[in-house]
Amino acid sequence: MSTLNQGDKAPEFTSKDQNGNAISLAQFKGKKVVLYFYPKDSTPGCTAEACDFRDNYQDLKAQGIEVLGVSIDDEKSHQKFITKYDLPFTLLADTDKSIVEAYGVWGEKSMYGKKYMGTNRTTFIIDEEGNIAHILTKVDTKAPTAQVLALIK
């Protein structure tokens, strides 16, 4: 689990988005950022989470909130995911695991009694100054936007 705490400076990163463009956290200084980590493109829980952010994206933008999704999937996978579900926000391809490791969300998981390494679904809300305002570890994949907005208000 994350070793970061509320109030900590959010770790800086630069990564490729779904189109191969370099995106850094510093680009969003002055805005609130919902940085959400998810295990895998096009899986049921991850799709529900992304679609909820999609469905509420205009409300988030109207409040000055940027949404960035992060998984270890590559750019091509992200492009398919975005196209299939009409996602309006940026997905970062953390193929070298540098962001998931910096944020402490890469770790051991268990499914059907088997242990494996993977991304623990976690959402960070980063304030306008680049500090971690909130960390959400118990994400409701069907209503993550409501969880985020409840914390921000």
Question: Would you name each region that the model predicts?
Answer:
Residues 1-153:
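Chalcogenol-based redox active-site neighborhoods
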